UniProtKB/Swiss-Prot annotation:
Keywords: Cell shape, Cell wall biogenesis/degradation, Glycosyltransferase, Teichoic acid biosynthesis, Transferase. This is Putative glycosyltransferase TagX. It is an enzyme of class 2 (transferase). The lineage of its organism: Bacteria, Bacillati, Bacillota, Bacilli, Bacillales. GO terms for biological process: cell wall organization; regulation of cell shape; teichoic acid biosynthetic process. Belongs to the glycosyltransferase 2 family. The keyword GTP-binding does not apply. It comes from Staphylococcus aureus (strain MSSA476). GO terms for molecular function: glycosyltransferase activity. Signal peptide: none annotated. Its EC number is 2.4.-.-. The keyword Transmembrane helix does not apply.
Amino acid sequence: MRLTIIIPTCNNEATIRQLLISIESKEHYRILCIDGGSTDQTIPMIERLPRELKHISLIQLQNASIATCINKGLMDIKMTDPHDSDAFMVINPTSIVLPGKLDRLTAAFKNNDNIDMVIGQRAYNYHGEWKLKSADEFIKDNRIVTLTEQPDLLSMMSFDGKLFSAKFAELQCDETLANTYNHTILVKAMQKATDIHLVSQMIVGDNDIDTHATSNDEDFNRYITEIMKIRQRVMEMLLLPEQRLLYSDMVDRILFNNSLKYYMNEHPAVTHTTIQLVKDYIMSMQHSDYVSQNMFDIINTVEFIGENWDREIYELWRQTLIQVGINRPTYKKFLIQLKGRKFAHRTKSMLKR
C-alpha cells in the first residue's frame, strides 16, 4: 500500500527531528511537512533531513494556521495520481511514532477492503515512560466497529494514532477555528466510514508539554467562543443521544472546565466578563444534551477558585443559576457558606495526606 503522512509545522524545532526519524514502515510512504511560517530552526532542520531519510517533502506557507497546513496536504493527495496514496495520516509535530507500531495500522488497513479508518491508542510521556491516555482506555482489543457501535470514538478528537482511507482527503479542516479545527472532519470521517478497525496498542506518543489557549483575557474569550461554536456545530451533526452525550462530556469537562480552571487559577479575581462567559456557556448547554455532573463541576470551579466576589457580580451569577434550576442564597449567606465549604475541602485534603 501507499501511505501519505501529513505533518503541519510551525516553530517546532524542539520536536520535529525526533518525530521524523521515528517514522518507519515496510510500506511505501511519503512524508509531507507543511510549514505555516516558522521563524525558528524548524525549516532548516527539515531541509537537512532528506540527506539522512528518504520520502520527506517540504511545502512552505506564510502565516498559515494548522488547519490550512493540513488542508494543503489533503489537497496534495487529491491532486496527485490516485495510485500514489491508498491512505493518509496526520501527525502532530510534537508527537512521536512508537517503534514498530506504524505497521500495526497499515496491516489492519490492508486486511479488509471495508476498512476506511484504523485507530490505535495514544500515549503521553510521564517522567520518561509512555502511559496510555485515559480517553483511549476503551480500546481493549483489536476489533472492527462503526461509530454507532462505538460512540466512545467521539472522545478522541485528535488526528494522532489514526489512519484514513485516501477517499477522506476530500474532507477539510475548519480554517476559521484555531483550536478545534479538526472536530468536524473527524466526526464526518467516522460517520462515513464503512468499518473502523481498532488496534489495542499505543501507536503515537505525545511529547508536548501542556499548553493552554487561555493565558489572558483575550485568548480566554476567543477560546470559549470557539468551543461554544464547535460544540453546537458537532451536536447538530450527531443523530444518536448517546453520541451527543459522549461528545458533550468531552467538550464540557476537558475543553471547557479544564481551561476554566487553568484561567481562574491564573486570574482568581471574579470579574463581570468571566461570569458572563461562563453564563453564556452554561446557557448554551441547555439547548442540547449534556451530563448533569459537568454542570455542577463548572459551578464548583467558579465558586471554589473565584475570589473577590462583590454583590453585583454575585447577583449576575445567582440569576444565571436560578435560570437553570439551581438555587443560591443571598450574597452574605453565600460568602459565609462558601468560606465553610472551602474550609471543609481544605481539611479533607489535609486528612488525605
